[in-house]
């Protein structure tokens, strides 16, 4: 059917499920569901807002954010897997560099581990030979070269003990782990870029991006989980939606003074809010 002939609404199914639920009988059929949807729509007609292009973008953004969260967990698992293997071939190799992932998902410590996958790849060379090899590697991979860093890596390699031998089988194990991590990391960075592009089409984008503690990654994530902010009538509604509103425990004359947050809302939104607050605590912006 043509979109022009129908008015479309996006409604939380939980609202429909709980609507008019005042019968002792529990009926579950397509006919009963259709009647319930119709009754809810007629009863709430004046409050419903028509589904729009902005809603489609928000739905896409939220879907991408859930995928982003999934692949971030996968990336963390692949990272831990690679580190556990490196502990048996080149302990500490993952700690030499802390530069963030590039747009293609590549990371210096991962690329370093792919080339110098065993500690013997470093210490079997002379110091000058390693410095020369490392410098050429940095140039080829377009990473910054530091002679002092090269010396530090070489000197540290003399004290390390490897468990797995330096052979083709061990190299293959490392290669597979690196490839899996790179694939997950690349997907994460692609989603990060796509989410920012989608979020930039929404009217609230400039306001959100101007907030302290929010950047091109957390900003779109925040927008994805909150959705259309205009549907909230007051600030308390947003805190309740996130589940960070204080709970209430009262009965008769008893009133609990300290009650944990309700946590009835979106756990993904709470996670994003926690990350924003973590940035604020660490950066401590003066004019915030």
Predicted regions and their residues:
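A detector of single, family-specific signature residues
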Residues: 1-288
């Amino acid at each position: 059917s043509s979109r022009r002939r129908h008015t479309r609404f996006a409604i939380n199914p939980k609202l429909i499920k709980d609507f008019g639920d005042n019968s002792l009988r529990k009926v579950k059929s397509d006919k009963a569901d259709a009647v319930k949807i119709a009754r809810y729509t007629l009863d709430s007609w004046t409050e419903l807002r028509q589904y729009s292009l902005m809603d489609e973008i928000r739905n896409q953004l939220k879907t991408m954010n859930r995928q982003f969260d999934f692949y971030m967990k996968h990336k963390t698992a692949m990272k831990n897997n690679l580190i556990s293997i490196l502990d048996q071939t080149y302990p500490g190799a993952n700690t030499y560099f802390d530069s963030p992932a590039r747009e293609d998902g590549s990371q210096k410590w991962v690329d370093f581990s792919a080339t110098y996958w065993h500690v013997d790849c470093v210490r079997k060379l002379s110091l000058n030979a390693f410095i020369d090899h490392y410098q050429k590697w940095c140039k080829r991979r377009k990473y910054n070269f530091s002679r002092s860093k090269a010396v530090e890596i070489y000197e540290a390699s003399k004290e390390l003990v490897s468990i797995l031998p330096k052979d083709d089988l061990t190299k293959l194990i490392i290669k597979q782990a690196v490839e899996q991590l790179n694939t997950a990391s690349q997907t994460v960075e692609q989603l990060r870029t796509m989410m920012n592009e989608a979020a930039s089409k929404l009217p609230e984008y400039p306001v959100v991006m101007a907030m302290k503690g929010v950047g091109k990654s957390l900003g779109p994530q925040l927008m994805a989980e909150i959705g259309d902010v205009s549907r909230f009538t007051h600030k308390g509604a947003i805190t309740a939606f996130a589940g960070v509103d204080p709970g209430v425990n009262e009965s008769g004359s008893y009133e609990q003074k300290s009650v944990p947050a309700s946590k009835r809302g979106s756990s993904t939104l709470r996670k994003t809010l926690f990350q924003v607050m973590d940035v604020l605590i660490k950066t401590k912006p003066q004019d915030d």
